[in-house]
């Protein structure tokens, strides 16, 4: 049995490592001191991730993503984990919940998220507030 990583997975990990070192690490100290990521930087990093094909690496091909196997996704996350979460999460993993979009929602919600044009968040209200999450 061959336990070596496929060469294309190694190349993805190397690409991600270079992205982290060149694009994310230089901003870590400033982001930590400011306790936020400036919008201009966020947009620039997202555009770079889209250009390199790293954005939405978790999405299947039929949703506009690369359709990477989980092992390749793990190798990408491993490299992104070398940077601050505040910066690494800009690379983007649109929520898989968007895959449940109805056909009429696909163009408006799912595809722009996969292309990096829309950013999504999930939030719950504070204690004692009504929520529909989980039922």
Task: Label each region the model flagged.
Residues 32-34, 96-97, 127-130:
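Juxtamembrane/interface motifs at transmembrane-helix termini
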């Amino acid at each position: 049995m061959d336990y070596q990583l496929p060469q294309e997975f190694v190349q993805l990990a190397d690409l991600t490592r270079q992205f982290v070192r060149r694009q994310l690490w230089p901003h870590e100290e400033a982001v930590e001191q400011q306790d936020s990521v400036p919008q201009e930087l966020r947009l620039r990093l997202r555009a770079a991730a889209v250009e390199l094909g790293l954005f939405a690496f978790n999405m299947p091909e039929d949703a506009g993503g690369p359709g990477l196997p989980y092992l390749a996704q793990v190798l990408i996350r491993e490299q992104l984990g070398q940077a601050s979460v505040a910066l690494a999460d800009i690379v983007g993993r649109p929520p898989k919940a968007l895959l449940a979009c109805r056909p009429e929602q696909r163009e408006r919600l799912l595809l722009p998220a996969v292309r990096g044009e829309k950013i999504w968040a999930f939030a719950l209200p504070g204690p004692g507030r009504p929520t529909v999450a989980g039922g």
